[in-house]
């Protein structure tokens, strides 16, 4: 590895951009550093500060990011969480030739419970874990890279410098120093996270249990028959006490379950390890995209079995009806903030393959109205309709009556939000939450009139399998206990 990163930003172009600033502005200094593996670079650089690493695995095109030393942390415990986000973005960003979608910004997670400030949802669940509604780090300095990544490719080391705090020359020097400091941390840092725990770990156990989950399914089906909802996503939580470091779990998960929205967030009091397949919202300028997933089949053991499962998924009347309903819901959500006539479905009902399951996926797009902000766009689609149901407000109220505990980060978002307001937010499904040496894994299923309760419970365990296996590979117990409690 070189002793320092090679500067890619032209100093004269940077000074011109900084000197032309007429409003609070950040300007980008970029350097390049070839590495073997971005995650290995993250492990060396992370240290003890709040940090994150996002990547697109499995061969998908995209961008990866990591940050290891935030300028500050944002946390919201009550109403106004999305206002906190909006207040932190909107700067005029001078990219100075940088093509990275989010060259610095806010990275972290949003809780499903932000929905309580967007809709009138009765607060009938408990919150024993005491998690905030939002936890984001403000990262002016990050590393980014193109996916898929080939060993020897460049990391883009980026500093988004607030130029109004410096002279143009001083701003460039500050950015140069920041990217070289990150390069030094990558070169000299210690990647160790400690040995696997010596104590005997325990398997995952469902907090609810099979019988209670199946009872939840039947209660939702009663509500469907009464006309209160058409479809609802019902979940339960699996818990496993384990001292395994989340970095080790994420490293195992990268191999067992590559996903387009994978990441680890190591923040005060809570760690997230995510392998989400689902995009909640992407904003690029005024262009908006969401990609709802609705419809699941287990992978086959052979290519022929996979092909048969794909065909069965596409042909299944229940899955087709559920998918169509949720695509319509997402079209309606984007329509709340999009220019009239701009909402479209350019990709409908494709089948995407993951390590354990196949999914039906569609793409819905729109163009954000000039009068609407990033906060408005997030509020329009949050939380995702595929993990609530339709109609969304009434269904979220029903979910609250059947689920005993708050969801927290589950079905919220893992967020990358640029200082300019461009953003990428996944839905935090297939996500482990670690708090106080216990891993929590919440999994759910979409319930419709003709769902089979036992089959829906089995589907939730299929969705959990890759993450349960990853914890086992890292030193925990890679299974769900056969005997689980029955807590309605």
UniProtKB/Swiss-Prot annotation:
L-tryptophan binds at residues 260-262. Chorismate binds at residues 295-296, 410, 430, 444-446. The keyword Lyase applies. Its EC number is 4.1.3.27. Coiled coil: none annotated. Keywords: Amino-acid biosynthesis, Aromatic amino acid biosynthesis, Lyase, Magnesium, Metal-binding, Tryptophan biosynthesis. It catalyses: chorismate + L-glutamine = anthranilate + pyruvate + L-glutamate + H(+). Binds 1 Mg(2+) ion per subunit. Pfam families: Anth_synt_I_N, Chorismate_bind. The keyword Lyase applies. Mg(2+) binds at residues 322, 459. Its cofactor is Mg(2+). GO terms for molecular function: anthranilate synthase activity; metal ion binding. One of its GO terms (biological process) is L-tryptophan biosynthetic process. It is an enzyme of class 4 (lyase). Pathway: Amino-acid biosynthesis; L-tryptophan biosynthesis; L-tryptophan from chorismate: step 1/5. Component I catalyzes the formation of anthranilate using ammonia rather than glutamine, whereas component II provides glutamine amidotransferase activity. Belongs to the anthranilate synthase component I family. Tetramer of two components I and two components II. PANTHER family: AMINOBENZOATE/ANTHRANILATE SYNTHASE, ANTHRANILATE SYNTHASE COMPONENT 1. This is Anthranilate synthase component 1 2. It comes from Halobacterium salinarum (strain ATCC 700922 / JCM 11081 / NRC-1). The gene is trpE2.
């Amino acid at each position: 590895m070189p002793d320092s990163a090679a500067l890619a930003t032209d100093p004269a172009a940077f000074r011109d951009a900084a000197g032309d600033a007429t409003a609070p502005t950040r300007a980008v200094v970029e350097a390049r550093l070839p590495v073997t593996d971005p995650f290995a670079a993250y492990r060396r650089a992370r240290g003890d500060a709040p940090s994150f690493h996002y990547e697109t695995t499995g061969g998908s095109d995209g961008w990866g990011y990591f940050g290891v030393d935030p300028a500050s942390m944002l946390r919201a415990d009550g109403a106004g969480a999305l206002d906190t986000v909006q207040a932190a973005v909107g700067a005029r960003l001078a990219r100075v030739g940088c093509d990275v979608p989010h060259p610095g910004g806010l990275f972290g997670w949003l809780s499903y419970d932000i929905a309580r400030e967007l809709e009138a949802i009765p607060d009938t669940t408990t919150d024993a874990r005491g998690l905030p509604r939002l936890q984001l780090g403000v990262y002016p300095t990050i590393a980014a890279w193109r996916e898929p990544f080939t060993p020897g490719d460049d990391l883009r080391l980026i500093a988004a410098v607030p130029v109004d705090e410096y002279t143009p020359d001083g701003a460039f020097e500050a950015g140069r120093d920041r990217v070289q400091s990150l390069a030094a941390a990558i070169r000299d840092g210690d990647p160790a996270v400690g040995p696997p725990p010596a104590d005997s770990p325990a398997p995952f156990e469902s907090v609810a249990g099979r019988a209670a989950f199946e009872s939840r399914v039947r209660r939702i089906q009663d509500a469907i028959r009464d006309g209160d909802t058409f479809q609802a996503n019902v979940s339960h939580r699996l818990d496993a006490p384990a001292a395994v470091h989340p970095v080790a779990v994420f490293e195992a998960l990268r191999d067992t379950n590559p996903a387009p929205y994978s990441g680890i967030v190591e923040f005060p009091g809570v760690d997230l390890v995510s392998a989400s397949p689902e995009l909640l919202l992407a904003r690029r300028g005024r262009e908006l995209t969401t990609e709802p997933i609705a419809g699941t089949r287990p992978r086959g053991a052979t290519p022929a079995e996979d092909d048969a499962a794909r065909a069965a998924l596409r042909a299944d009347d229940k899955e087709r009806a559920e998918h169509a309903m949720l695509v319509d819901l997402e079209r309606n959500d984007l329509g709340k903030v999009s220019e009239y006539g701009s909402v479209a479905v350019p990709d409908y009902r494709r089948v995407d393959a993951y390590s354990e399951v196949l999914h039906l996926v569609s793409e819905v797009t729109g163009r954000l109205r000039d009068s609407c902000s990033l906060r408005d766009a997030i509020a329009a689609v949050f939380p995702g309709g595929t993990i609530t149901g339709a109609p969304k407000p009434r269904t979220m109220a029903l979910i609250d009556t059947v689920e005993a505990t708050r969801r927290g980060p589950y079905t919220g978002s893992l967020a990358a939000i640029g200082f300019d307001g461009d953003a990428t937010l996944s839905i935090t499904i297939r996500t482990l939450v670690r708090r106080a040496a216990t891993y929590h894994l919440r999994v759910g299923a979409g319930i419709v009139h003709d769902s089979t309760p036992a089959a829906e419970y089995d589907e939730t365990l299929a969705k959990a399998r890759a993450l349960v296996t990853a914890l086992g590979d890292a030193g925990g117990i890679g299974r769900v206990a056969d005997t689980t409690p029955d807590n309605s």
